[in-house]
Swiss-Prot record:
NCBIfam families reported for this sequence: PS_decarb
GO molecular function: phosphatidylserine decarboxylase activity
Catalytic site: D96, H153, S257
Gene: psd
Listed name of the protein: Phosphatidylserine decarboxylase proenzyme
Subunit structure, interactors included: Heterodimer of a large membrane-associated beta subunit and a small pyruvoyl-containing alpha subunit.
Role according to the record: Catalyzes the formation of phosphatidylethanolamine (PtdEtn) from phosphatidylserine (PtdSer).
Catalytic activity: a 1,2-diacyl-sn-glycero-3-phospho-L-serine + H(+) = a 1,2-diacyl-sn-glycero-3-phosphoethanolamine + CO2
Cofactor: pyruvate
Length: 290
């Protein structure tokens, strides 16, 4: 017999399939960029109160300092608010949030949530070279809730070699949906960034979600919108190669989402403190060089 709790859970999942994800996201994006003075400041204040956001670490502490909700949402933090671990053999977490999942890639399968797996082929848009690169490697998935700092940083010194935009759905990526929507991260819109590092090839994926109005990178600006119906690839070779330092900002979300890191086999050992649903901060240790 179905309980009222399981009924509502099924209803929430069903709603994700039928709601107009892109239109809702476009509407949210339009509202988020409006500059409505006191109305905007009131909305920001209410949002900060609801999610218990610590404004003391923001460069601009006053709600009235933000002209739009988007400006507030990607607010930069004060210097040293997130110290970067300086151990040269360690990689750092790229974002504030919670660990959604982490661990070993079993041949080409990654754990999404208990009982749910997804493949490297699906996640990496069937890029055969990348799939082979990360078979039997390691992965970490970090979920950024609405209350978190939404700029994304580099785990280590790196050189950008490729960026891939993959169109897709815009399901919510909160932990509940991760447990109930199969192939969630591999079906959502995402931006895949491929780096050369002293820890081997590393991928950092910025995954879109419902109400995530845009994803941007520091070298290319806003990637979406506009949204495209086909995979787009940019390569960065020779003089066009982009070099980034450990802890340096590399991108942002305008509203919450997820970051997935992939590492090659036998290159890194994930930090012992990483565990599912564990709150983490950008700059803390993610992994060590093997």
């Amino acid at each position: 017999m179905m309980t009222s709790n399981s009924y509502w859970q099924r209803l929430k999942v069903a709603f994700q399939y039928v709601m107009p994800q892109i239109y809702l996201t476009q509407i949210a994006g339009w509202f988020a960029k409006q500059k409505w003075g006191k109305i905007t400041h009131f909305v920001i204040k209410a949002f900060a109160k609801k999610y218990n956001i610590d404004m003391s670490i923001a460069q601009k502490e006053q709600f009235s300092d933000y002209a739009s909700f988007n400006e507030f949402f990607i607010r930069p933090l004060k210097e040293n608010a997130r110290p970067i671990n300086q151990n040269p053999t360690a990689l750092c977490l790229p974002a504030d949030g919670r660990i959604s999942e982490c661990g070993h890639i079993d041949d080409n399968l990654l754990l999404q949530a208990k009982g749910h797996f997804f493949s490297l082929e699906d996640l990496l848009a069937e890029d055969k070279e990348l799939v082979e690169t990360f078979k039997n490697g390691e992965f970490v998935t970090t979920y950024l809730s609405p209350r978190d700092y939404h700029r994304v940083h580099m785990p280590c010194d790196a050189t950008l070699r490729k960026m891939i935009y993959v169109p897709g759905d815009l399901f919510s990526v909160n932990p509940f949906l991760a447990q109930h929507v199969p192939n969630l991260f591999a079906r959502n819109e995402r931006v895949i960034c491929v780096f050369d590092t002293e820890f081997g090839t590393m991928v950092q994926i910025l995954v879109g979600a419902t109400i995530t109005a845009s994803i941007g990178t520091t070298w290319a600006g806003v990637i979406n919108p506009p949204r495209h119906n086909e995979v787009k690839t940019w390569t960065y070779e020779g003089e066009s190669a982009v070099k980034l330092l450990k802890g340096q900002e590399m991108g942002w979300f305008q509203l919450g989402s997820t970051v997935i890191n992939l590492f090659q086999a036998n290159q890194v050992r994930l930090a012992d403190h990483l565990s599912v649903n564990e709150p983490v901060r950008m700059g803390e240790i993610l992994a060590y060089k093997k």
